[in-house]
Amino acid sequence: MSPETQTVDGNDAISPKPLTFHSEFDKFLLLNILIQRSSHKEFPYLFGLHADLPAYNMNGKVKILMMNERIHDEFLKILAEELIPAMGCTEPIALAYAGARAREVLGCLPDRVIAYCSGNMIKNVRCVTIPNSESMVGIEAGVMLGIVGGNASKCMEVLEDLTDEDRKTAAAMLRDGVCTVEYLDSEIPLHIILELHKDASVVTLEIRYDHTNITKITKDEEVIFSSDHKEGGCSLADRSLLSVDNIKDFADQVPLKDIHELLDRVIIHNMNIAYEGMAGSYGLGIGKIIKESYPDGVAVRMKAYAAAGSEARMGGCDMPVMINSGSGNQGIASSVPVIVYARENNICQERLYRALAFSSLLTIYQKEFIGKLSAFCGAVSASCASGAAITYLLGGTLEQIKNTIGNVLANIPGTICDGAKISCAAKIATSLDAAMMAHYLAMNGRAYQADSGILQEDAGETISCVGYIGKEGMKQTDKEIIKIMLQ
């Protein structure tokens, strides 16, 4: 088992030998002995630079990898930026956040408010119940609740501390017609401009690209704050490093101490709202119907709990969700199925953490091409990531993981987004059906080949093409959807 030494650039370098075991038990026993009794210094050939455990596949051969330090650091930043708590559907919450921040600058309640909203903002606020509002719905309600009782320092949990008095005041101001909504003809899908008036004083606040990305604040024509952040500019991490290969390497090797606290919050928050959706009365009760109507099995429970969590969130449940890429539904769809699958199959917590890191980053990677809001349903991207993460969870090879992705995107790449609403839960269930079928096909060595429709030679190329269709090709589709919804 001693390592071979070779000379690289005049220096002795250690290169690993693959270790072959006669059984999985032998492998498990040896690895645990080495981990417990040795240090990185004593066995540098066994441990990767950042690895808790060697990455290994299921044929008994250990593959020792050295993770790029930059990838490690940047991917941790990406996860920290995108996996954040939010209470309620993120678009009305963005309006509430804008209202709360603008009111801070104004210094008092306004007597007139104008909310200019892009088409995608209108589409995604129109039908969802605002949390902690006692069933209020709509753009005006989101803005006024933020203005009256929002706490901007809590970002996407801005409405957490609303009181009965806040709700009464907001409702009275809504009845008086204090807030009006104007369509903002913008090429930026997520674009908000708020004007708050009080006597002769005016505060204007603008948000672009991301739900809390304030780009400009003025008071009485004086610029208080200005940022030139373009799309993606609000990210401090380098997203160009994202690829299926790099995501898998990161998930294999990242020290669990670097990710477990963040992913514990994902598990706790997203499973809590899934349980609430199953127990409570939200929407059509789709989770319970799925669980009771289909033959019992892990795939059915995955769909049921993920759909239930989405329906509760869309129905105004005030429990927080750990969102992904600005979306609670994507946060739920990329995590709950993986958690349910791991628990049902008694897969260890450490492996679950790695699968969740993989699923989360794969969702983010897909959304980098599509954008935060578009005519393309985000449930497809997140469910695709869950299916691929389950392939990863079961020790699937990189090829099998990529085939899972391709099998999903060969099937349901054209699902439209017609706004946030309770039927998003049904789209999650349907997308998970496709994701599990893709997983089963891949694990049985079956995959749709390149040139099958839009599929490309590599999964990353396919993801890029689907993103291009969602972001550019479906622009007119998005406009027609919004036009129909506003009729």
Predicted feature descriptions by range:
Residues 85-101, 319-335, 378-381:
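Conserved phosphate/anionic-ligand binding catalytic regions in large, soluble enzymes, centered on
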Residues 87-90, 120-124, 128-131, 209-212, ...:
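A structural signal for small-residue-enriched, beta-sheet-centric alpha/beta enzyme cores
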Residues 93-192, 196:
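Early transmembrane hairpin of solute transport permeases
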Residues 102-105, 131, 341-354, 364-430, ...:
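Hydrophobic alpha-helical bundle architecture
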Residues 137-139, 144-157, 161-166, 170-173, ...:
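Mobile "lid/hinge" segments at catalytic clefts and subdomain interfaces of large enzymes
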Residues 175-316, 481-487:
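Signature of multi-pass transmembrane helix bundles
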